[in-house]
């Protein structure tokens, strides 16, 4: 999401993804042959996701970032010395509402990179269209995505889902 070449800003996104998929599949087959192993069944996916995206300060998958500023929470086991260390350092924390006796939740303020795409920068339809392009031209499976929908967009989203019903999964 943070690389314009891999977003709707690239007018040739469909052909870019198709070519990259061809190369990835061919490379997988070539190296499987060289190593004498079966080729992977599915090699294309949308990354980074979750924890890895945090390590490299990247948007997760094809999700737009939530906002320019947000609070990231991390859970720590109360028996873990790192949890006690973080508490001793004054990192904002509170007991987990589900496991208050055993888990502490730490809160970290996060600032998105300058010019990062956030959920308010794209309409729900733009988010869905980009997801559909990735499904059709990159992923060998169904990519997942979280779509942020404004109150006035629900009818258009419903129409999009109806029009693409046979392709809808992971949204």
Segments (PLM) and residue ranges:
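Short capping micro-motif at the N-terminus of alpha-helices
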Residues: 41, 54-55
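Catalytic alpha/beta core of large soluble enzyme barrels
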Residues: 48, 55-171
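Internal maturation/activation junctions in enzymes
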Residues: 4-47
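Extended amphipathic alpha-helical segments enriched in small hydrophobics
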Residues: 1-4, 164
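Predominant activation on well-ordered alpha-helical scaffold segments within soluble catalytic domains
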Residues: 1-2, 29, 83, 158
């Amino acid at each position: 999401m943070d690389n314009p070449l891999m977003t709707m800003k690239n007018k040739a996104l469909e052909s870019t993804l198709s070519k990259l998929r061809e190369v990835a599949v061919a490379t997988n087959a070539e190296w499987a042959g060289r190593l004498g192993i079966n080729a992977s069944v599915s090699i294309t996916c949308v990354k980074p996701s979750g924890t890895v995206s945090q390590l490299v300060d990247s948007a997760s998958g094809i999700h737009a970032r939530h906002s320019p500023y947000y609070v990231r929470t991390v859970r720590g086991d109360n028996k873990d010395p790192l949890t006690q260390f973080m508490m001793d350092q004054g990192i904002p924390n509170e007991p987990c509402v589900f496991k208050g006796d055993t888990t502490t939740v730490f809160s970290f303020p996060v600032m998105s990179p300058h010019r990062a795409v956030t959920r308010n920068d794209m309409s729900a339809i733009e988010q869905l269209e980009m997801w559909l392009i990735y499904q059709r031209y990159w992923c060998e499976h169904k990519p997942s995505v979280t779509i942020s929908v404004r109150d006035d967009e629900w009818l258009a989203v419903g129409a999009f889902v109806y029009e693409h019903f046979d392709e809808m999964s992971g949204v």
